[in-house]
Amino acid sequence: MTEFWLISAPGEKTCQQTWDKLMTATTRTNNLSTNNKFNIPDLKVGTLDVLVGLSDELAKLDAFVESVVKKVAQYMADVLEDSRDKVQENLLANGVDLVTYVTRFQWDMAKYPIKQSLKNISEIISKQVSQIDNDLKARASAYNNLKGNLQNLERKNAGSLLTRSLADIVKKDDFVLDSEYLITLLVVVPKTNYTDWQRTYETLAEMVVPRSTNLLFEDHDSGLFTVTLFRKAIDDFRHKARENKFTVRDFQYNEEEMKADKEEMTRLSTDKKKQFGPLVRWLKVNFSEAFIAWVHIKALRVFVESVLRYGLPVNFQAMLLQPNKKNMKKLREVLYDLYKHLDSSAAAIIDQSAMDIPGLNLSQQEYYPYVYYKIDCNLLDFK
C-alpha cells in the first residue's frame, strides 16, 4: 500500500502526548495503520492575510507539482519501453525509494531555507518545478521525434512484401541495368500461386525473357520474384499479372538512394542510443527533484493549515499514517472520534459523506476535523 495520510492535530500539553494518543488509538490493539512523526521545522508564520492567500496558492501548486511528478514518471516508463519492471527502481527520491523518503522526511534546509518567508519558499518550488516541466517538454519532443522517424523507417523495412522497403532484400546482380531495351521487374506472388507463376510468367506478355525468374525473398504469405522483359511490354505485362493475382512492385534499383536509406536508419538508431542514457539520467535526477519538492509542498500545506485552524503560538504534531488497506474505513472512524472535538462543523460533513449524497463535491467530502492531505506514492498508470 503506497498511500499515506499526512495529518496534524494540536499539541496537548506536549506534542508527544498528541503522538502517543494517536499511536494508542491506531496501532496498540487494532493495527489500523503504520505511523511516523512527520518533521516540519519552525517556519516563518507571517501575517494571517498572507496565510489565507497562501493556502489557496499552495493547493494549486500541489496539484501542478503532482502532475509534473506523474509526467516525469510516466515518461520514464515510456522511454524504458520493454523494461517497465525497471521503472520503479529508477523512481527514487534522494537515492531511496519513495516510501522510505516520505516516512523519513527531513526538510531540505539548503534548497528551501527556513529563514525565507513561506511565500518565498513556495515561489522557489514553483520556479524549480516549472523549469523541470519545460525541460521535460523539450527533451520529450526531441526524443519522440527521433523515435518516431526511426519507427517509420523500421515500419518501411517490415510488413508485407507489397509495401515494405526492398533495400535490404535486393542487390545489383538481381537486375539487368543500363539496357536500352530490357528491364527487370519485381513481382509479388502469393505462395499458393507459385506453380501458376512458374507456368505462366513467360506468356503473360510478349517479349518476356525465358527462364528469367528468380525467387529473391519470402515472407509468410508471398514471395518476391524477378522477371526480365522488353521495356515496351511493361504495361501489358502489369495488366496481365494483375489479372492472375501477381503484383508488380513499382521499384527502380538506385544504389545511392538505398545506401542513403540504410545510412539514415543507422544514424537514427545510433542517435537514439546516444540520447537514451543521458535522457534516463535526466529523468531520474528530475523525478527525484520534483518528488522532493512535492513532499515539501505537503509539509508547507500542513504547516499553513495547522496555524489557520489551531491558531498561535504554533503548537501541533504532524503525523504520517500508512493505512492498512483493509481497515481504511475503520481508521477514518477512529481518527474522527479522536479529533471531532476540534471542529463541530465537520460532524455533519462526516455524516453526509457516509450517506454518499449525489452532487456533494469531493473537497467537501474530504474535510475532516483534523488537517489532512493524501500522499500517494503510486505514480504510474500502467495501461
UniProtKB/Swiss-Prot annotation:
CDD domains for this protein: V-ATPase_C
N-acetylthreonine carried by residues: 2
Keywords: Acetylation, Hydrogen ion transport, Ion transport, Transport
Any one GO CC term of the record: vacuolar proton-transporting V-type ATPase, V1 domain
Function noted in UniProt: Subunit of the V1 complex of vacuolar(H+)-ATPase (V-ATPase), a multisubunit enzyme composed of a peripheral complex (V1) that hydrolyzes ATP and a membrane integral complex (V0) that translocates protons. V-ATPase is responsible for acidifying and maintaining the pH of intracellular compartments and in some cell types, is targeted to the plasma membrane, where it is responsible for acidifying the extracellular environment. Subunit C is necessary for the assembly of the catalytic sector of the enzyme and is likely to have a specific function in its catalytic activity.
Subunit-level organization: V-ATPase is a heteromultimeric enzyme made up of two complexes: the ATP-hydrolytic V1 complex and the proton translocation V0 complex. The V1 complex consists of three catalytic AB heterodimers that form a heterohexamer, three peripheral stalks each consisting of EG heterodimers, one central rotor including subunits D and F, and the regulatory subunits C and H. The proton translocation complex V0 consists of the proton transport subunit a, a ring of proteolipid subunits c9c'', rotary subunit d, subunits e and f, and two accessory subunits.
Protein name, as recorded: V-type proton ATPase subunit C 1-A
Gene: atp6v1c1a
